[in-house]
């Protein structure tokens, strides 16, 4: 450039004004980056800069601005992109022919130097994207591992890996998987394709050394084959790290390790594993990325990552290796399955199939005794934990005696203990809720819980002799929740309980027989999983079952109320009016078979989850922010692609 005061040489062109530098924000559904480019920059040049940040080939990038796809030859000024505006980025999937999978055996066995970060040229060759991707391998496409950055579908697979070790064992034993995992170079390249791992290796070279060591990769794959060994190794390592704090200088080593290695690694996969188990409650609301590590001595012990967050410390006592907590099972299904509680109940019946038969025998004996003609003065007392049957002197079955406090008894048919009423009385055990359910045992039919909460659902006696002063109550009666003389006849729940149980006894007997058959149990689980998929993918088809359910409910609800066999011939004088509200159609629905009622719950209890608009609300907002304003077209595209925003954008482009 000519200095000030000097004339330009003759024949030289006139000075051209420098292009204006602008700042463009590139936003993806999960990330956002800022780029400083000139306004004359073409879209192709911008894609090349974006590909270096997002580790993707420029041909995979699609830039969207104001609802339009930006073309490569156009400049930013021609597209109307000005300083401070946002351009949306969509990374397309990798589509290649199956013939590119053949050179898998030609992967070099020696990787880069330890700690070195592979260059973009080594990750993306000149002829296209990487030659290896799980999305191209036959048999693994259903696992969803072709998505970049491990989206939500593999996260559910990882949660199953933690909670169901048998699933991983079956997956590893598949003949195709060992051949895939035996190629350590392929596994290393698959891991390096993750942008989070790229950034982690850049800041921590020792992780790159681990990935470049084939022996460590082989040992890791062997641990995957044996989940018990892997869990024991992790527990032993945690004990060593906990003892490291007591060694002089060990606290500084722990601070460095957790700040520089553990926290970035766990935060990188936080969406997949549900959070950082090493983060304490005091640091949940703090920003760990900007805060400096404290140089003070740690006075608090490190948190135990193996402690369950759903229950107390005593919930893990006596737990075996193959056991699972009920909240862990419920987290793998949508919220409406938490209302039905069918999977939990089938799981418990599978673990102890004899419990249902024992309970049904005690229930059948109690019902047969209740149908006998009662005495003229006193009502027949219900079965209670006593050694003899009142009035007959015959010993009661041990099953019916212990059924009140048995944890394996179905919760929707169990009587509550006296501590649930808030007053004195014998306690059958801890962990009972207000309706007498065990807190870790779900209901089979949720409708019975509503009817059980209307009245004190306990084996109460309504003997008129108990209200006469000077006459003591029989010893087998429990402590009353309130004076028996004030208790109306209409509050006796025994007749209603009989009407509810008797139509379901044949079904429960068949259910017990099915629990002993592994194939039948697997079929029941497949039915539930099919209903889950149907409620998500085709909610309107599930609504089609409503006329059938309504007809079944009306037939079951039309059962005439019979006379109470437990009622005395001489009722109490001047009984107060009944306090029951009128039974509506929803409450009469529990008289229908449980599996039909499960379908009814899917439609009626939480209809918002069955609406596609509510299910894809977040994805619809993302598409609207990208400029796609046709909500109906966006919804149809999301339904067709299963909620994948990138695939929905491609479908909208083609339409």
Curated annotation (Swiss-Prot):
Domain (STI1): residue spans on this chain: 194-233
Q: In which tissues is it expressed?
A: Testis specific.
* InterPro entries named in the record: STI1_HS-bd (IPR006636), UBA (IPR015940), UBA-like_sf (IPR009060), Ubiquilin (IPR015496), Ubiquitin-like_dom (IPR000626), Ubiquitin-like_domsf (IPR029071)
Q: Basic and acidic residues bias located where?
A: 318-330
Spell out the Polar residues composition-biased ranges: 432-441
* Top-rank taxon, per record: Eukaryota
One of the entry's Gene Ontology molecular-function terms is: polyubiquitin modification-dependent protein binding
The residues covered by the UBA domain are 609-655
Bias-annotated ranges (Low complexity): 110-122, 279-290, 377-395
For this record, the Gene Ontology CC terms, alphabetical, are: cytosol
Question: What sections of the sequence does the record tag as coiled-coil?
Answer: none
Q: Enumerate the PROSITE patterns for this protein.
A: UBA (PS50030), UBIQUITIN_2 (PS50053)
Q: Which residues form the Ubiquitin-like domain?
A: 22-98
Q: What protein name applies here?
A: Ubiquilin-3
Which organism is this entry from? Homo sapiens
From the broadest rank down, the organism's phylogenetic lineage runs: Eukaryota, Metazoa, Chordata, Craniata, Vertebrata
């Amino acid at each position: 450039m000519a200095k000030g005061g000097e004339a330009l040489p003759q024949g030289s062109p006139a000075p051209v004004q420098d292009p204006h530098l602008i700042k463009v924000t590139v936003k993806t559904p999960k990330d956002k980056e800022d780029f400083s480019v000139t306004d004359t920059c073409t879209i192709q040049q911008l894609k090349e800069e974006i590909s270096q940040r997002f580790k993707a080939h420029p041909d995979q990038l699609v830039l969207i601005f104001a609802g339009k796809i930006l073309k490569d030859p156009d400049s930013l000024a021609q597209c109307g992109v000005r300083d401070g505006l946002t351009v949306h980025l969509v990374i397309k999937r990798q589509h290649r022919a199956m013939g590119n999978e053949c050179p898998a055996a030609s992967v070099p066995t020696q990787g880069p130097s330890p700690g070195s970060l592979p260059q973009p040229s080594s990750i993306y060759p000149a002829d296209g994207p990487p030659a290896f991707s799980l999305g191209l391998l036959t048999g693994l496409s259903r696992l969803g591992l072709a998505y970049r950055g491990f989206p939500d579908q593999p996260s559910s697979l990882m949660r199953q890996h933690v909670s169901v070790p048998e699933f991983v064992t079956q997956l590893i034993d598949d003949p195709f998987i060992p051949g895939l995992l035996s190629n350590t170079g392929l596994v290393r390249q698959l891991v390096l394709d993750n942008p989070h791992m790229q950034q982690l290796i850049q800041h921590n070279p020792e992780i790159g050394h681990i990935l470049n060591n084939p022996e460590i990769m082989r040992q890791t794959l062997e641990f995957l084959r044996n989940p018990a060994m892997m869990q024991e190794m992790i527990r032993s390592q945690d004990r060593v790290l906990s003892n490291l704090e007591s060694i002089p200088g060990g606290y500084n080593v722990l601070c460095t390790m957790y700040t520089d290695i553990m926290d970035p690694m766990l935060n990188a996969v936080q969406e997949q594993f549900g959070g950082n188990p090493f983060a304490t409650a005091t640091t949940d609301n703090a920003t760990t990325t900007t805060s400096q590590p404290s140089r003070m001595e740690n006075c608090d012990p490190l948190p135990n990552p193996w402690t369950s967050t759903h229950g107390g410390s005593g919930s893990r006592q006596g737990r075996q290796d193959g056991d699972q907590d009920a909240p862990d099972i419920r987290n793998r299904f949508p919220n409406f399955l938490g209302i039905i509680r069918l999977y939990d109940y089938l799981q418990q019946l599978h673990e102890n199939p004899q419990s249902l038969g024992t309970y049904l025998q005690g229930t059948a004996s109690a019902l047969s005794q209740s149908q006998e003609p009662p005495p003229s003065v006193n009502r027949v007392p219900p079965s209670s934990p006593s050694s003899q049957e009142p009035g007959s002197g015959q010993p009661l079955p041990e099953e019916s005696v212990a059924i009140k406090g048995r944890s394996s008894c179905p919760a929707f048919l169990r009587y509550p203990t006296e501590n649930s009423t808030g007053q004195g009385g014998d306690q059958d055990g801890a962990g009972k809720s207000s309706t007498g359910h065990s807190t870790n045992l779900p209901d089979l039919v949720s409708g019975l819980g509503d009817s059980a909460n209307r009245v004190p659902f306990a084996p109460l006696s309504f003997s008129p002799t108990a209200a006469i002063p000077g006459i003591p109550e029989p010893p087998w009666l429990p402590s009353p929740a309130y004076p028996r003389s004030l208790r109306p006849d209409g509050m006796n729940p025994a007749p209603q309980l009989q009407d509810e149980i008797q139509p379901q006894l044949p079904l429960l007997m068949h259910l017990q027989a099915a629990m002993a058959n592994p194939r039948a149990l697997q079929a029941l689980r497949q039915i539930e999983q099919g209903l889950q998929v149907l409620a998500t993918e085709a909610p309107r088809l599930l609504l089609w079952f409503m006329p059938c359910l309504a007809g079944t409910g009306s037939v079951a609800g039309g059962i005439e109320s019979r006379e109470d066999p437990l009622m005395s011939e001489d009722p109490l004088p001047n009984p107060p009016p009944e306090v029951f509200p009128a039974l509506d159609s929803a409450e009469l629905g529990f008289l229908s078979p449980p599996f039909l009622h499960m379908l009814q719950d899917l439609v009626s209890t939480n209809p918002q989850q069955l609406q596609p608009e509510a299910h894809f609300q977040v994805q619809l907002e993302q598409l609207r922010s990208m400029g796609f304003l046709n909500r109906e077209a966006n919804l149809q595209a999301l339904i067709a692609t299963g909620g994948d925003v990138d695939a929905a954008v491609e479908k909208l482009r083609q339409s």
